[in-house]
Amino acid sequence: HGFVQNIVIDGKNYGGYLVNQYPYMSNPPEVIAWSTTATDLGFVDGTGYQTPDIICHRGAKPGALTAPVSPGGTVELQWTPWPDSHHGPVINYLAPCNGDCSTVDKTQLEFFKIAESGLINDDNPPGIWASDNLIAANNSWTVTIPTTIAPGNYVLRHEIIALHSAQNQDGAQNYPQCINLQVTGGGSDNPAGTLGTALYHDTDPGILINIYQKLSSYIIPGPPLYTG
């Protein structure tokens, strides 16, 4: 359980959507992060994969602000302390807003995957996962923005999928977090994307899986990685 509480973009700090505080405030600060109604700090499971809640978390609404990022620039997402039992992949997507991200219809966003990390080492099941590397990096994850994509406004969809109960159908726990970015530069690629409600199904091999057995490999969920 957890959420992104701070974001560092090209060395500049931006506050996250503090779901443990902001829903209870009459006038919460405007941020680049999307708001959610997940005040339990919880997740979306397979029963929500074909609903809008999987896109940017439960009841998500666009952040009012947008942060500039240079092509090849870095976005560091700083989480609340992540439970070490919650092993799983960390996946990052971008979707063009085709306009202002603060007013975008999330159900129309088409995401392409820009980074993925899954099972690192399975010598001693459940093994070492991307989530463990996130914990080791002081509960943070850094994603690099591709240099090849066309400039414009994008939603970054950053996600941990916790697999500690994934041996049961709908046992995997998705924690998507979205932020608004304005990518600058001279790229020209407009990669094909996938609607958020089509990213996952609850029987995908990387979603319905027992991580407490020896795994020869792990198939990271979602569409193929964009490599530029």
Curated annotation (Swiss-Prot):
Uppermost EC category: oxidoreductase
Family as reported in the entry's similarity comment: Belongs to the polysaccharide monooxygenase AA9 family.
Enzyme Commission code(s) on record: 1.14.99.56
Catalytic activities: [(1->4)-beta-D-glucosyl]n+m + reduced acceptor + O2 = 4-dehydro-beta-D-glucosyl-[(1->4)-beta-D-glucosyl]n-1 + [(1->4)-beta-D-glucosyl]m + acceptor + H2O
Record's keyword terms, sorted: Carbohydrate metabolism, Cellulose degradation, Copper, Disulfide bond, Glycoprotein, Metal-binding, Methylation, Monooxygenase, Oxidoreductase, Polysaccharide degradation, Secreted
InterPro entries: AA9, AA9_LPMO
Sites bearing Methylhistidine, chain numbering: 1
Species of origin: Thermoascus aurantiacus
Biological role: Lytic polysaccharide monooxygenase (LPMO) that depolymerizes crystalline and amorphous polysaccharides via the oxidation of scissile alpha- or beta-(1-4)-glycosidic bonds, yielding C1 and C4 oxidation product. Catalysis by LPMOs requires the reduction of the active-site copper from Cu(II) to Cu(I) by a reducing agent and H(2)O(2) or O(2) as a cosubstrate. Is able to cleave cellulose and xylan to produce C1- and C4-oxidized products.
Source lineage: Eukaryota, Fungi, Dikarya, Ascomycota, Pezizomycotina
Compartments, as annotated in UniProt: Secreted
Any GO molecular function: monooxygenase activity
CDD domains, sorted: LPMO_AA9
Classification via PANTHER family: ENDO-BETA-1,4-GLUCANASE D, PUTATIVE (AFU_ORTHOLOGUE AFUA_1G12560)-RELATED
Name the UniProt record assigns to this protein: AA9 family lytic polysaccharide monooxygenase A
Cofactor: Cu(2+)
Free-text biotechnology note from the record: Lignocellulose is the most abundant polymeric composite on Earth and is a recalcitrant but promising renewable substrate for industrial biotechnology applications. Together with cellobiose dehydrogenases (CDHs) an enzymatic system capable of oxidative cellulose cleavage is formed, which increases the efficiency of cellulases and put LPMOs at focus of biofuel research.
